[in-house]
Amino acid sequence: FLSQVDPIDGKFKTNESTTQVHWRTLPFYERVALVRIQDPAWTPHNLVAYYLTDQGALYRLNGLSAPIHDVNAKAPIKVTDENVIEYLKFFCFFVRGEEGPFLIAEDSNDQYIPTEMDDNTRSVIEGTVRPATFEGKNENGHYLCDAVVFYSNALFIANFAVEPTGMIQMLDDDPIAADLPVSVEAPIS
């Protein structure tokens, strides 16, 4: 696998002795796996590269939506009442804005929520995060979801419509806390 992707993005060299590769299946695809690659020699040190793999084809998750939509069309995606929240979390994490992921913040102990912060900030985050919810379907068959989003240094409550094809639309977002002294740091490219 490493020989297929080395160097990642033309700049991150892999090494059989130091590069860690992990994979897992995703419940909204039958044959697609998510591959996670990390190496302590890379800068920034918290960089993690991700790929989707479908029957040998690799799709680099680089912050853009195109690789996900390509896999959704090819695999194809199968969104259900039971897996829509996991798909929403996946999509929002891997499709980036200028300031990083749209982290669906369900728990203050999430690995991507900063741990170093003052007590007031911790209180705001702990008092805001909550499990994302599936609220049912609309007349178009879109899955309606509600979630707390941690983007950059702000928290929002957002409402989403997830289409069966995997397209996601943020219907509404209300800021809860802005200009926090911490932000989500989870580089993928």
Per-region residue spans from a language model:
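Extended, low-hydrophobicity segments enriched in charged/polar residues
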Residues: F1-G127
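Acidic, serine/threonine-rich low-complexity disordered tracts
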Residues: A132-E135, N140-L144, V148-S189
